[in-house]
Amino acid sequence: QLLGPALGALEVECQTQIDAEGVINSRNPEELLDVFSLLTWVKQTLNMTKIPVPDILTDRVAHIAPVLRCLRHGDGTLARFHGGGQGSEHILDQALAISGVRPSVPQDRAMGFARLNAGATSLIMDVAAPPLGPARFSAHASTCAFELSVGRNRLVVNCGSGLSFGDDWQIASRSTASHATAGIEGLSSSRFSHAKRGHFQALKETPKIVSVQKTE
């Protein structure tokens, strides 16, 4: 009696919270991993109990997998952007295996990030404006910031979320200065407004035009 409504609600959430390219509004890679892990668990459970898997669930899993592969470093962890940490490489590996989505050459762009590869070296860069809507309360001023890894060694990383260290560090970690990118006189590429949700301040005055071009 509860399964039908639960799956119906899940279908609505998949439709409204994840777009057709497997992207969530927050642009937080670790949050996307959490979503992906839960969806693959549901898919596996339905398969084991011979219950049809909703088409929208299968579709979103198929599109999230390559996004997460694009945002992985050589050690299997995720790039730290917009409040996300590195995530668990083991949880990601398990979720990818359960998904059944075969690995391919990583996308060079996904969820507002660009990826470059050369041998064992990979670079992941934020090439979009910070997210708006509710996500603006946790977004970082990280436009044009990057992380760089060689093999399993991460050489250049961002500070990540400072939330666990208190309000002041939470704000500081969201500023441009806490990211691997160029800054001008200590100013952030996006400004903080006075609007708050709990202890979180919203970003405002985000970059209007962010373009990227890849040349061989």
List where the protein language model places each region.
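A short, hydrophobic/aromatic-rich structural module that often spans a beta strand
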Residues: 89-90, 94, 174, 178, ...
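Alpha-helical cores of eukaryotic small-GTPase signaling modules
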Residues: 1-22
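Extended, loop-rich substrate-binding clefts of extracytoplasmic carbohydrate-active enzymes
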Residues: 109-122, 188-216
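Active-site rim segments in enzyme catalytic domains, especially the processed small/beta chain
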Residues: 142-205
